[in-house]
Amino acid sequence: MSYFKGVSIAKAANILYDGNITSRAITFEDGSKKTLGIMLAGEYELNTVNKEIIDIQRGKIDLLLPANEWQEFEGPASFTIPANTKFKLRVHSLVDYCCSFIKE
């Protein structure tokens, strides 16, 4: 989906790693949430609360989930992170992404 309709958008950005990862939260009429963001090149460790589906619009990223090998993704691509998971990212180039939060 290239466009979202009927959403509320947070004015304030979520800023992580001194601005190397930024996103804006959007909430849909049904209460579901996504973030739209940018990641700059670097290595990061993040955590999930809910299951997340990350859609890479453009850019190249490596993902390391617990008990797995590094996996490479280049946009357009998507991957899923389970709930309550600590994971690592190696971002090779500017990444434009959309993250969907899935409550289970």
PLM features: what roles do these ranges have?
Residues 1-32:
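A short, N-terminal "cap"/entry segment at the start of jelly-roll beta-barrel domains
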Residues 38, 48, 65, 91, ...:
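Residue-level recognition of conserved beta-strand positions in structured domain cores
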Residues 67-87:
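Short acidic-glycine-tyrosine-enriched beta hairpin
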